[in-house]
């Protein structure tokens, strides 16, 4: 049975423990209104990382499974490896780590695959330390790891994996955002690839002040709506006027998929992370499940197969596995 671990406090390592395994879920980042700031986990899909404490003072990756695409085994070029290198350096550890990564998240899907490997590795490694470090410290090392994948430090895929639920992620702190338990998320991943770096390149160029004002207004409406449990406020604000218009042309079928979600009573819908996955919020699980076939049909209409997940927005964080 999986063992849930409270990520808010350091848990002393079992004496003599040499191996630990952790699971970290996929995640939705940006959430339409919080570019590089907001994110939440997706229960039921994620990456598993096994970490062994070794005598050699190095970090090495022994295996990566679950993907047909070759991922770098060099620790410094892998998000999980780079995060553990950052941890080792900060603590001046006299020992090292060996990792095995089992991928459960499609690459370049907009579902936080690189972040999941990174956080799972840190959670497992933390259990092997004589004196485990705090979540805040782990988060800083995760930022170092995630920078390998995206080219910059941003925590919107990372923070939710440490705290669970909707999280506001600055570079200095993580702030949990209360969301009604009944609210659910639908995520649909079309079988297409959109590299994060390419998606970020689409954001280059000039922006108008009016766009920033509108986006700030939408962010405020969503946060206020979540805090108050007011679906109408969230519905008024859960739309992206800043990033989505620049990335949507890169995602075949996005406009049709978004419209299908909105036609089925979604509070809002937009791009998950860098895409091509699409997310939508609903007031109930039943509503989210009812919308899934329509959103998938929209992608099928442009020749794309897809997978769909319905999960609570308040999904759990990364956890150690027994």
From Swiss-Prot:
Indicate the segments annotated as coiled coil, or none if absent: none
- Chain residues that bind ATP: 106-116
Which Pfam families is this protein grouped with?
GHMP_kinases_C, GHMP_kinases_N
Q: What parts of the sequence cross the membrane?
A: none
Instruction: Please cite one Gene Ontology biological process associated with this protein.
Output: threonine biosynthetic process
Q: Mind telling me which GO cellular component terms the entry cites?
A: cytoplasm
Q: What class of enzyme is it?
A: transferase
Its Enzyme Commission number(s) read 2.7.1.39
Gene3D superfamilies assigned: 3.30.230.10, GHMP kinase, C-terminal domain (3.30.70.890)
Per its record, the protein catalyses:
L-homoserine + ATP = O-phospho-L-homoserine + ADP + H(+)
Q: Where in the cell is it found?
A: Cytoplasm
Q: Which UniProt keywords apply?
A: Amino-acid biosynthesis, ATP-binding, Cytoplasm, Kinase, Nucleotide-binding, Threonine biosynthesis, Transferase
Involved pathway(s)? Amino-acid biosynthesis; L-threonine biosynthesis; L-threonine from L-aspartate: step 4/5
A GO term for molecular function: homoserine kinase activity
NCBIfam families named in the record: PRK01212.1-4
Q: What does this protein do?
A: Catalyzes the ATP-dependent phosphorylation of L-homoserine to L-homoserine phosphate.
What family does the entry list?
Belongs to the GHMP kinase family. Homoserine kinase subfamily.
Question: What's the protein called, per UniProt?
Answer: Homoserine kinase
Tell me what organism the protein belongs to.
Xanthomonas campestris pv. campestris (strain B100)
Instruction: Please name the taxonomic classification of the source.
Output: Bacteria, Pseudomonadati, Pseudomonadota, Gammaproteobacteria, Lysobacterales
What gene does the UniProt entry assign to this protein? thrB
